[in-house]
């Protein structure tokens, strides 16, 4: 069944259908290039397929040591997260269990995490959207105050298909909608 679905997608002529009708232009099999990839938007198998793909990507990230580890004082259990995701939007999380790690070291680890995530998404045929990308560094002083970006400088850079771009960094006091919530 899977082979039948993929072969059909790769060999058919694709048109776009909207409320205004079907597109006149189309794309389809290219005998001199690679076949179209993906399973198409609106495919009923899309959510399950993406869940299967992202579960492998998340395990790769975890195997590389990325994520957020903490101890829940309520449940008395260890928690380990790599990301929060919904459909094709994902928030990566990262912390260090080393109380002596510096903000600069954490930013360097976050850059490696971003490069790894971007590479894994690229391997699926996807790409990260710079305009939807932003990050926070939650750095707390011994006095319990949040450090500003000026106090803990650093940038994260998306490779962006060979056109590197600095991702917007927000102060912890600034909210931004993500995954449909604030």
Residue ranges and their predicted role:
Residues 1-111, 118, 126, 137:
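Conserved polymerase palm-domain catalytic core
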Residues 122:
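Anion (oxyanion) recognition and catalysis
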Residues 16, 20, 127-174:
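Short, conserved micro-motifs composed of acidic
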């Amino acid at each position: 069944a899977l082979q039948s679905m993929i072969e059909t997608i790769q060999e058919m002529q694709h048109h776009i259908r909207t409320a205004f009708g079907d597109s006149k232009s189309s794309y389809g099999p290219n005998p001199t290039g690679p076949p179209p990839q993906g399973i198409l938007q609106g495919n009923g198998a899309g959510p399950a397929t993406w869940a299967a793909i992202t579960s492998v990507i998340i395990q790769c990230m975890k195997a590389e040591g990325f994520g957020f580890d903490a101890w829940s004082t309520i449940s008395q259990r260890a928690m380990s997260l790599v990301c929060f995701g919904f459909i094709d939007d994902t928030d990566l999380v990262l912390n260090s269990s080393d109380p002596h790690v510096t903000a600069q070291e954490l930013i360097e680890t976050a850059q490696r995490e971003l490069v790894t995530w971007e590479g894994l998404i690229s391997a699926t045929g996807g790409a990260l959207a710079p305009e939807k990308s932003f990050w926070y560094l939650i750095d707390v002083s011994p006095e319990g105050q949040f450090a500003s970006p000026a106090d803990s400088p650093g940038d994260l850079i998306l490779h962006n298909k060979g056109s590197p771009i600095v991702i917007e960094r927000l102060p912890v006091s600034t909210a931004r909608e993500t995954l449909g919530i604030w």
